[in-house]
Amino acid sequence: MKVIIVEDEFLAQQELSWLIKEHSQMEIVGTFDDGLDVLKFLQHNRVDAIFLDINIPSLDGVLLAQNISQFAHKPFIVFITAWKEHAVEAFELEAFDYILKPYQESRITGMLQKLEAAWQQQQTSSTPAATVTRENDTINLVKDERIIVTPINDIYYAEAHEKMTFVYTRRESYVMPMNITEFCSKLPPSHFFRCHRSFCVNLNKIREIEPWFNNTYILRLKDLDFEVPVSRSKVKEFRQLMHL
């Protein structure tokens, strides 16, 4: 797995380089302190991941990531920065992770393990666009200006709140900066169903289906004390999905 480091502080660059070599099998093929130099390098070289600071000369890390996102081969991007206010932008760019300085060594090592696993899955998957959700498929969620790499199967349901979407797992909740239609489009339709204009539910997390008023249903979920409604307009499709 080939990676580059983009960091204009020499000591920070050296520390990150040491951690990568010490705790992973990744090959560092370049270190840079200037955004434009990175773009020039990537025009002729392919890498699998980029560890990226934001406050760098010539072209800041966010703009650099926006340019890289247009490439046919999109490397994983891990932001490592002191600027916490760019976490939402990083999510929109589908960054793999967003780590704030100063960081704990354990935070870096945990990220490296997940990154190598994601890369291995990318290499071995012959059907990357398949609708079947594997146990280790993940999605990036935002919490407290941090990106949390979350297994898709951990999501129980999502609920619309105006232009935002609240996402719920068994123990956590997340606020996503997008409407529920956009968020649901990121989920595999074989496992998630838009049961109501305000709700999307993980079909695998349904514990009980109770008939409700006007031929609708209430869904009770495993492990959560919460009921998700099925609207009248979605009843027919829901019955077909659940073989009712």
UniProtKB/Swiss-Prot annotation:
Gene Ontology terms for molecular function: phosphorelay response regulator activity; transcription cis-regulatory region binding
Protein's GO biological process: cell motility; positive regulation of single-species biofilm formation; regulation of DNA-templated transcription; response to antibiotic
Mod. after translation: Phosphorylated by YpdA.
CDD domains assigned to the protein according to its UniProt record, in alphabetical order: REC_LytTR_AlgR-like (cd17532)
Subcellular location: Cytoplasm
Start and end residues of each Response regulatory domain: 2-116
Keyword Phosphoprotein: yes
Location of 4-aspartylphosphate modifications: D53
Domain of life: Bacteria
Domain HTH LytTR-type: 139-244
SUPFAM superfamilies assigned to the protein according to its UniProt record, in alphabetical order: CheY-like (SSF52172)
Any one cellular-component term (Gene Ontology): cytosol
Free-text function comment from the UniProt entry: Member of the two-component regulatory system YpdA/YpdB, which is part of a nutrient-sensing regulatory network composed of YpdA/YpdB, the high-affinity pyruvate signaling system BtsS/BtsR and their respective target proteins, YhjX and BtsT. YpdB regulates expression of yhjX by binding to its promoter region. Activation of the YpdA/YpdB signaling cascade also promotes BtsS/BtsR-mediated btsT expression.
Name of the protein in question: Transcriptional regulatory protein YpdB
UniProt organism field: Escherichia coli (strain K12)
Gene for this chain: ypdB
